[in-house]
Amino acid sequence: MIHFLLCFNRQSKVRLSKFYSTYTPTEKNRATREVMNQVLSRSPKFCNFVQWREFTIVYQRFASLFFVMVTDSTDNELVTLESIQRFVVVLDIVFGNICELDLIYEFQRAYQVLDEFLLTGHLQESSSKEILRAINDAEGMEKSLLVAEVLDQHFL
């Protein structure tokens, strides 16, 4: 099970975070800080897996961003690493070459992709095509609702 996902830059600025286990706000802040310190203190030559408490930290760096999943220590690290890779590929397609600014200014879309990808800490959909199809359907529905709202306002 994935307990939480973080995305942050080298300056320890969190750009995306989602917790799938119950934590108090204080525990979330502490866990986030500890995980960021663990990841940022490691050399790029080291393995992308770190034991932390009773969990395993699995991370991957893409440009200036670190994508981190904290999982049970019994989970397969390579599958988790592949999940991170898939998530970033889908973000790359949705945003057209993902960058940190996309996560800052269009964080709703990033969370939408994440919600299509993971559900309650488990991989919901592994197919990039299905994730993209669901996102396109949701955006199409959102646009049609917006058009209907505008029509209602102007023609009532």
Curated annotation (Swiss-Prot):
CDD domains: AP1_sigma
GO CC annotations, alphabetized: AP-1 adaptor complex; intracellular membrane-bounded organelle
Main location class: Golgi
Pfam family, one: Clat_adaptor_s
GO MF entries: clathrin adaptor activity
GO biological process: protein transport; vesicle-mediated transport
UniProt-annotated location(s): Golgi apparatus, trans-Golgi network; Cytoplasmic vesicle, Clathrin-coated vesicle membrane
Key word Membrane present: yes
Keywords: Cytoplasmic vesicle, Golgi apparatus, Membrane, Protein transport, Transport
Keyword Protein transport: yes
Leader sequence residues: none
UniProt record similarity statement: Belongs to the adaptor complexes small subunit family.
Self-association and partners: Adaptor protein complex 1 (AP-1) is a heterotetramer composed of two large adaptins (gamma-type subunit and beta-type subunit), a medium adaptin (mu-type subunit) and a small adaptin (sigma-type subunit).
General function of this protein: Subunit of clathrin-associated adaptor protein complex 1 that plays a role in protein sorting in the trans-Golgi network (TGN) and endosomes. The AP complexes mediate the recruitment of clathrin to membranes and the recognition of sorting signals within the cytosolic tails of transmembrane cargo molecules. Also involved in early steps of phagocytosis and macropinocytosis.
Protein name: AP-1 complex subunit sigma-1
UniProt organism field: Dictyostelium discoideum
